[in-house]
Amino acid sequence: MDLRSTLLVIGGSACSFKLLNTIVRVLPTPVLARKKAWKWRNVSTSLAHSSLTGAWAVLCFYFHPQMVEDLISSHSVLSHSLVAVSTGYFIHDFLDMAFNQSFKQSWELLLHHSVVISCFGLAVTTRLYLGFAVVSLLVEINSVFLHARQLLLLSGQRNRPGTEVTAPRPSVTYIITSWLNLGTFLVFRVSTLGWMVRWLAGHSEHIPRYILMMGTAGLSLISVMNTVLFYRLLRADILTDTHNTSKNH
C-alpha cells in the first residue's frame, strides 16, 4: 500500500471501531454493567480488536513465513494492512479514554497507546519493521481472555449464583477464562516480549539509533506494565481464591 492508502486504512479503522463502540451502546447491557456503561463499551470494543488482530497476526506468519527470518523489510499486504488497522484502533481507544476517563485512571494506558501508535505509525509509513509489529500483535491472543475476564467482572458473573455473600466461589466460566488468561499471558506476553528483546539486542547494529532507542524505551515500558499486570492477576484470581478456600476449611 502507498502512503495515501495506508492513511485511509488507519482513518477507516479508527472510524469503524468508533462505530462498533456506538453499536455496543444500543445493544442490551447486563444490569450490573450499566453502572459502568462506558467501561463495558470500551472493553467490548477492545475484545473485538483483540479477536480480530490476534488471529490476523497468526495468519500473517502462516501465509508469509519468510517474514520470521526478516522482521525489518519483509512484509505482505496482509501484514501491512493488519498494522494499519491496529494503529487505527489504538488511536480510537486513546481518544475514547482521553475524553471519557480521568487522567489519573487512564494515564498508564494512554502512555502505552502513545508508544504503540508511534512505533506502529513508523512501521506503516516506512514499510519497515512491519514483521516486528506483527510479532507484537501476537500479544492480542492473550488480550482476548484478558478482556473476556473484565466483561465477566463488570457483569457480575465472577462468582456462582448464591455464593456471593456467604462464601464466594468463582463460576466455572470465570475459572476457565482466568486460567486461559494466565496461561496465554505467559506464552503470548512474557515469551513474545522476551523474544522481541532478544531480537532487538541481536540486531542492534543493523537498526538506526533513534529506532533502537524507541524500541528499547517501548519494550522497557511494556515489560514493567506486564509485570504489574501479572501480579494483579495472580493476586486477584489465584492468591485471593487460595486464601478464601483455606479460610472456608
Regions of interest found by a model, annotated:
Residues L151:
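Conserved beta3-strand ATP-binding lysine motif
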Residues M1-V139, S143-L146, G156-H249:
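Membrane-helix and juxtamembrane interface regions of eukaryotic multi-pass membrane proteins
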